[in-house]
A protein has these predicted regions:
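Single conserved hydrophobic/aromatic residue that forms the stacking wall/gate
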Residues: 1-9
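Domain-level detector of nuclease and nuclease-like folds
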Residues: 12-146
Length: 146
């Protein structure tokens, strides 16, 4: 069987203009940057399984959710993926991303910082805090990942 992939603990790295940090267990902790739309069509295949991402804490109803959305050129690999409730990923979070994309398309400067909140040693966040700054105006939104 394939060795389970994991990220380094307490690490900081950049991909596609975004900065990511991991916590003391190697879980995705923050993802942030100034949003930009990717310059190519289509989506890259996600190579990591939901089990690679959730380390056994994922639910059967979870999607492999991007922290920074694919449309914003968010990485399509382990460092940008979390077990995300499919209802949240395909509805509330997608609507949030749609609004941010409209702001980017309108030429506004949109900064997004996401912080994942994990219960105990779980690799599945139970909440995601999103801090958006659009042309200097900051808003905070919390998404529950039930």
């Amino acid at each position: 069987s394939r060795r389970q992939r994991q990220m380094c603990i307490r690490d900081r790295y950049k991909r596609n203009g975004y900065e990511y940090t991991t916590d003391h267990l190697g879980r995705l902790f923050t993802a942030e940057g100034n949003l930009h739309l990717k310059e190519h069509d289509g989506r890259l295949q996600i190579k990591d399984s939901i089990h690679d991402i959730g380390k056994g804490y994922e639910k059967s109803t979870d999607d492999r959710g991007h922290a920074i959305a694919d449309r914003f050129d968010g990485a399509n690999d382990l460092e940008n993926l979390i077990p995300q409730d499919s209802g949240l990923n395909r509805n509330e979070f997608k609507n949030f991303e749609n609004k941010l994309a409209q702001e980017v398309e309108a030429g506004k400067k949109v900064n997004l910082k996401l912080e994942m909140h994990y219960p105990g040693d779980s690799f599945r966040p139970d909440a995601i805090t999103a801090v958006t700054t659009i042309d200097g105006k900051q808003e905070v939104k919390v998404f529950l990942n039930d």
